[in-house]
């Protein structure tokens, strides 16, 4: 097992990475102070890992209940969030009840948001079971739900007590979900660590094959980078925005097609292709680096062409973005691997990028 720490003073927490961790009670025990635990999971993950988690928690002598949500990005909304509150209130959960998010990014984001809101804040633990949630969404305290007009527009910054990332859970992950997670790994290397990006290029096939050593290294390094960024800028005042490379275009794709048509990581992968193209058009990035970025995204079996939503529709969707100010779209663009720039772009350049990267 590897442990990475997120250094946030008195709200610091560990990220435990390894195989078989869901069944290890000693990883959960230090973070459960009250007499009850509510597991929040979904219809896909509960049959796979719910019993193992409940068995791990049993020796702790806590009252354990489970809320099972429908699976998919389309359910990341108020109605599903209320199912969590319904379960907590029915079970008479109190302020010391610990929520445990067992699932991917949707489960983690909604459980964290429920924890932030219920009785004005109860503790929660992240147990991410997808590659994307292990390398990205479970770390950093971003929680929330989607709105029909924009992704993740309703939420809170609320840190977990711990992240327990069991890479053994990745063996049951569908291929599309695995590729979606590799997209966030590529993003992390591209924005923050040129050497890690080199490693990803050399090992993308190993990641596609689910090689345990490659997955463990990718999760560890991605978490180290995200932890350092979050520690420096927890509430996305500046530096943390670089983690949204590929997300401005990507969120527009997700909202434009309807949540769940493309996986989040698929949209981010394509969004990175689009952001790379725009980076070259604005004279920030060299063409050879853009081609390297496109090649590794394609090698991860991610889409490299976006849907033809229309120029005006893309702009409208990108203006409904947490980085936008007074309706001005802000893009995270590459100068070189490991070096980014947050900037606006002329509409003409954006339209040229859309013409080149959509179909």
From Swiss-Prot:
Name the CDD domains for this protein. Answer: DHQS
Per UniProt, subcellular location reads as: Cytoplasm
Q: Does the keyword rRNA processing apply?
A: no
Q: What is its EC number?
A: 4.2.3.4
At the top level, the lineage of the source is Bacteria
Q: Which InterPro entries match?
A: Dehydroquinate_synthase, DHQ_synth_AroB, DHQ_synth_fam, DHQS/DOIS_N, DHQS_C
Give GO terms: molecular function aspect only.
Answer: 3-dehydroquinate synthase activity; metal ion binding; nucleotide binding
- State the top-level EC class: lyase
Give the record's family classification: Belongs to the sugar phosphate cyclases superfamily. Dehydroquinate synthase family.
The protein's name in its UniProt record = 3-dehydroquinate synthase
Q: Which organism is it from?
A: Burkholderia lata (strain ATCC 17760 / DSM 23089 / LMG 22485 / NCIMB 9086 / R18194 / 383)
Q: What is the lineage of its organism?
A: Bacteria, Pseudomonadati, Pseudomonadota, Betaproteobacteria, Burkholderiales
